From Swiss-Prot:
Pathway: Amino-acid biosynthesis; L-arginine biosynthesis; L-ornithine and N-acetyl-L-glutamate from L-glutamate and N(2)-acetyl-L-ornithine (cyclic): step 1/1; Amino-acid biosynthesis; L-arginine biosynthesis; N(2)-acetyl-L-ornithine from L-glutamate: step 1/4. Keywords: Acyltransferase, Amino-acid biosynthesis, Arginine biosynthesis, Autocatalytic cleavage, Cytoplasm, Multifunctional enzyme, Transferase. It comes from Nostoc sp. (strain PCC 7120 / SAG 25.82 / UTEX 2576). It is an enzyme of class 2 (transferase). GO terms for biological process: L-arginine biosynthetic process; ornithine biosynthetic process. GO terms for cellular component: cytoplasm. PANTHER family: ARGININE BIOSYNTHESIS BIFUNCTIONAL PROTEIN ARGJ, ARGININE BIOSYNTHESIS BIFUNCTIONAL PROTEIN ARGJ, MITOCHONDRIAL. This is Arginine biosynthesis bifunctional protein ArgJ 2. It catalyses: N(2)-acetyl-L-ornithine + L-glutamate = N-acetyl-L-glutamate + L-ornithine; L-glutamate + acetyl-CoA = N-acetyl-L-glutamate + CoA + H(+). Belongs to the ArgJ family. It is found in: Cytoplasm. The active site is at 180 (nucleophile).
């Protein structure tokens, strides 16, 4: 999608350029609010978290920010003290150029791990950036944060007079354990810091934290939201609903663009003892290489789903005799379908989005997670990815 001026939140501007970090495409994105924002961020729990994560986590502790720096094609992870110094220098340079206090800036970085930033190029490219800020171009920003993505990822909604927009990137090294790959949300709605924090974290937990491409949690996962309040207050419930819709849209875009992916997998587990159990079982299914390859081959092999459920060894209250497995609405376990239904099941498994539904019949809680199939393309892309 492309945003029009009428669908763009007011009071934001951007500076987007190529600094030569890896190639000739946009690799530096700066998004600024005209006024200080209520803000929140959630980040990777990886033990190898990069300086961008640690700095942003610190800067957002007070629930305020006015700008976000996003660098693509280089994660700046595992570079020791020099990597920390480089990230801090970039924040200081942007602060000097824009007049925003360094502590009111967040930074995110994505790309190859273990390479230092080309800091001389970055220094040169940021000279005069404060005078080059233009009306916010969220479409270009979504393209500028891409690495191995094949399409940009953007979504928007309106609540009353306020607009919300979200951009994200990610196709591999994706099983968020806090937040997401990289995702950024901007709104001109007025909202308190505590309310924003509650809504944002609930949204992330039920969308991005329910996404898995390859079970690998990134060292750079970051999700940040800025709300500048210029459009005034909006109903909290409507704001929360709109934010969740945007996040859900972005999750599906990421799943569709998973490295080598041809299909989205949606797994819903219901009748669980609690939400955590439902989510654990659903994740076990969507993460299974055998389930993923069965989906790729349009093979309705429900035994692989049963296997994935069975791996959840800590869920001692799951009784196989009570479990029901469906592909779409067709029940495959207990095995009640006839041989003539096999073609129908193959049709279901051939869709661009394959729905797997499991009922545990223990309690009342439900969780839905998303992923994609596993193909030769994933191996090819990652086998050739240069360090």
């Amino acid at each position: 999608m492309s945003l029009t001026a009428s669908s763009t939140p007011q009071g934001f501007s951007t500076f987007i350029t190529n600094l030569g970090i890896r190639d000739t495409t946009e690799d530096f994105v700066f998004l600024r609010s005209d006024v200080p924002c209520v803000a929140d961020g959630v980040f990777t729990q990886s033990l190898f978290a990069g300086p961008s994560v640690t700095i942003s986590r610190q800067n957002l502790q007070d629930g305020q920010a006015q700008g976000i720096i996003i660098i693509s094609k280089n994660a700046n992870v595992a570079n020791g003290a020099v990597g920390i110094a480089d990230a801090q220098e970039i924040i200081q340079l942007v602060a000097q150029e824009t007049g925003i206090a360094a502590e009111n800036l967040a930074i995110a970085s994505t790309g190859v791990i273990g390479r230092r930033y080309p800091i001389e190029k970055i220094r040169a490219g940021l000279v005069g950036m404060g005078q080059k800020l233009t009306a916010a171009d969220f479409d270009l920003a979504a393209r500028g944060i891409m690495t191995t993505d094949t399409v940009s990822k953007i979504a928007a909604r309106q609540v009353g007079n306020a607009k919300l927009v979200g951009i994200a990137k990610g196709v591999g090294m994706i099983e968020p354990n806090m937040a997401t790959m990289l995702a950024f949300f901007f709104t001109d709605a007025a909202i308190s810091a505590n309310t924003l924090r509650q809504i944002f974290r609930s949204t992330i937990d039920k969308t991005f934290n329910c996404l898995s491409i390859d079970t690998d949690t990134s060292t750079s996962d970051s999700a940040v939201i800025l709300a500048n309040g210029l459009a005034g207050e909006v109903p909290e419930a409507e704001f929360a609903s709109a934010l969740q819709e945007i996040a859900h849209d972005l999750v599906l875009k990421i799943a569709r663009d998973g490295e080598g992916a041809t299909k989205v997998i949606e797994v819903t587990v219901d009748s669980a003892a609690n939400y955590a159990q439902a989510k654990r079982v659903a994740k076990a299914i969507v993460n299974s290489p055998l389930v993923k390859t069965a989906v790729y081959g349009a093979d309705p092999n429900w035994g692989r789903v049963a296997m994935a459920i069975g791996k959840c060894e800590d869920e001692r209250d799951i009784n196989p005799d009570q479990v029901v497995i469906r592909f779409d609405e067709v029940q495959v376990y207990p095995n009640t379908f006839q041989a003539e239904n096999l073609e129908k099941l193959k049709e279901i498994m051939s869709k661009e989005k394959v729905n797997i539904h499991v009922s545990l019949n223990i309690g009342t809680d439900v969780a839905t997670v998303w992923g994609c199939d596993l193909t030769e393309g994933y191996v090819e892309i990652n086998g050739k990815y240069s360090t």
